[in-house]
């Protein structure tokens, strides 16, 4: 897709089928029998196609991860019914004890489940393989494919060279396998300080791909691990762990984002070296890359998201303005809408920007058919029906959903004092304004229909000492009630919503906008903090119709004429509703 693109539509109006080059690869592999009749190391039959989702538990998942989750679990689900079957493994890549935490690990699993995916019995941790990874490292050492380097981290970095200069061999590169093995075991046994030695693969310091210049694969870290405790003081790095974990889990298609494209030769080198040494057998896994998700008005850098939280630009990881899964869930996006969004944007190898409106439209399309309707007055203005008896009330009703009559009706009363939206009245109406305005000269005030109620005519209005409008007065027409024969005698252009002041339920409503004013806050040399939107959250006191009194957290509604709202996951309670605006009825982002 082009910059800030949206899925295209066909002439018939249907959204075009998104591209997915990975399906073509898998189809080819299935047709060729590349992964047919596979068995694991124990000789047990396994599916032909195995994908995996392997996040590091060092932060909360975000919308970009959702794309990868939907891709990997979605491919497995789609191919599971074909010959040979398929599955997706869930793996936590927990090899860095310094940055990882149980809180993050639990949140990751909760996010994947919330999105609607199930890994069954196939939940793995990279830390499960620490013993095997160490064993394989020793095998590489014994076969002169790895060595212990005693240079400082700065010297290792300097001697790697750069794109225009080849690297320099470490003075320790020609240590014998026995020397390396002894040092590596002493590293394991805790005899050295952090950073005193590392284990490097012995590849080629003149390789044009800097990743292949004897990469570091083990380092000393005297830090307890959240799962293995103090058992280990050396830990494998991602590039070493990732491919071996894939091979141990019999992954067929290891799918990651484009930033790992330069790491693929290293992935292949490690797996193929261990295959040559008899550790693995064909077919070994292969890595494929796809373009990461770039969503307008959004950042997905873990470091920058952490900065937003720590510097209190937002109210935590689950702030509804955050692109984290916990944030967009609290905002009111549904699992179905996220999956629909990921399906629509497709998968490609070319970086592009996806317009935020694509995500919002996916939510509208999901909730249009299944969100109950409700009335909410967000910016209340009192409306007094002068010719209506204050001691009287008139029963009214409205469908819970216009296309689901089986859901029944909402019941409420028409009374003398009502709440309407302040925007539905203008003292001096502009051209094309068909809602309430007072008499002008010899012309009577405007007439509007109060939805599911009566037609009223504006007679006058009242203001406070500062000139602020505090009350609008109207007369109603008793024979104009909606649903009665007389209602057809009144032709009005304006149709507004209302709530009886006697029945209105007070509520806190939070109106969210983009967190950033720039559609590309993380691009170029700009400071993303300079683009923070100071008006990204507005908290207002609103009124809801009486049926909303006992809503539960995460109940979703379409507030008619406003948009889709959700009862806040944390703060809303029966009798004290708090709602978040998820998205408006129409795309209003500029």
Swiss-Prot record:
Keyword check for Nucleotide-binding: yes
Alphabetic keyword roster: Aminoacyl-tRNA synthetase, ATP-binding, Cytoplasm, Ligase, Nucleotide-binding, Protein biosynthesis
Bilayer-spanning residue ranges: none
Motif 'HIGH' region boundaries: 55-65
Residue numbers binding L-glutamine: 93, 238
One Pfam family hit: tRNA-synt_1c_C2
MF GO annotations: ATP binding; glutamine-tRNA ligase activity
Compartments (UniProt record): Cytoplasm
Similarity remark: Belongs to the class-I aminoacyl-tRNA synthetase family.
Complex and partners: Monomer.
Protein name: Glutamine--tRNA ligase
Native source species: Polynucleobacter asymbioticus (strain DSM 18221 / CIP 109841 / QLW-P1DMWA-1)
Gene: glnS
């Amino acid at each position: 897709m082009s910059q800030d693109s949206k899925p295209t539509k066909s002439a018939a109006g249907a959204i075009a089928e998104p591209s997915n080059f990975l399906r073509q690869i898998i189809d080819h592999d299935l047709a060729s029998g590349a992964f047919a009749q596979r068995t694991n190391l124990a000789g047990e039959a396994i599916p032909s196609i195995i994908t995996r989702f392997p996040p590091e538990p060092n932060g909360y998942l975000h919308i970009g991860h959702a794309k990868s989750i939907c891709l990997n679990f979605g491919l497995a689900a789609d191919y599971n019914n074909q010959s040979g079957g398929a599955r997706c493994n869930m793996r936590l890549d927990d090899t860095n004890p310094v940055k990882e935490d149980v809180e993050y690990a639990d949140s990751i699993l909760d996010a994947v489940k919330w999105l609607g995916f199930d890994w069954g019995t196939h939940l793995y941790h990279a830390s499960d393989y620490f013993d095997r990874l160490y064993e394989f490292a020793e095998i590489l050492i014994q076969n002169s494919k790895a060595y212990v380097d005693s240079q400082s981290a700065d010297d290792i970095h300097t001697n790697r060279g750069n794109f225009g200069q080849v690297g320099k061999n470490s003075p320790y590169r020609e240590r014998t396998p026995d020397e390396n093995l002894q040092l590596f075991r002493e590293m394991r046994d805790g005899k050295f300080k952090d950073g005193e030695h590392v284990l490097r693969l012995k590849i080629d310091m003149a390789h044009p791909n800097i990743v292949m210049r004897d990469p570091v694969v083990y380092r000393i870290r005297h830090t307890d691990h959240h799962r293995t405790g103090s058992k280990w003081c050396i830990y494998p790095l991602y590039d070493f762990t990732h491919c071996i974990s894939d091979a141990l889990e019999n992954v067929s298609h290891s799918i990651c984002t484009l930033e790992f494209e330069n790491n693929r030769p290293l992935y292949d080198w490690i797996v193929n070296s261990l295959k040559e040494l008899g550790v693995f057998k064909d077919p070994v896994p292969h890595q494929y890359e796809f373009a990461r998700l770039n969503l307008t008005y959004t950042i997905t850098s873990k470091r920058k998201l952490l900065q937003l939280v720590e510097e209190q630009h937002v109210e935590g990881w689950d702030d509804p303005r955050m692109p984290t899964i916990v944030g967009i869930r609290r905002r009111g996006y549904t699992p179905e809408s996220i999956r629909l969004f990921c399906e629509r944007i497709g998968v490609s190898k070319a970086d592009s920007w996806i317009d935020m409106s694509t995500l919002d439209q996916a939510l509208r399309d999901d909730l249009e058919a299944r969100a109950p309707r409700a009335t909410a007055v967000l910016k209340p203005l009192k409306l007094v029906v002068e010719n209506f008896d204050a001691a009287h009330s008139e029963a009214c009703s409205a469908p819970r959903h216009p296309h689901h009559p089986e859901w029944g009706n909402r019941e409420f009363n028409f009374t003398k004092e009502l709440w309407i939206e302040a925007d539905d009245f203008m003292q001096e109406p502009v051209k094309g304004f068909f809602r309430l305005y007072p008499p002008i000269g010899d012309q009577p005030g405007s007439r509007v229909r109060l939805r599911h109620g009566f037609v009223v005519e504006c007679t006058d209005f009242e203001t406070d000492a500062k000139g602020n409008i505090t009350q609008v007065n109207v007369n109603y027409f008793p024979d104009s009630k909606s649903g009665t024969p007389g209602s057809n005698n009144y032709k009005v252009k304006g149709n507004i919503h209302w709530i009886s002041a006697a029945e209105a339920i007070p509520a806190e409503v939070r109106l969210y906008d983009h967190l950033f004013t720039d559609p590309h806050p993380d691009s170029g040399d700009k400071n993303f903090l300079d683009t923070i939107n100071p008006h990204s959250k507005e908290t207002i006191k609103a009124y809801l119709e009486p049926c909303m009194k006992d809503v539960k957290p995460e109940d979703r509604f379409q507030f008619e004429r406003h948009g889709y709202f959700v009862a806040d996951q944390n703060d809303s309670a029966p009798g004290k509703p708090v709602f978040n605006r998820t998205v408006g009825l129409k795309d209003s982002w500029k």
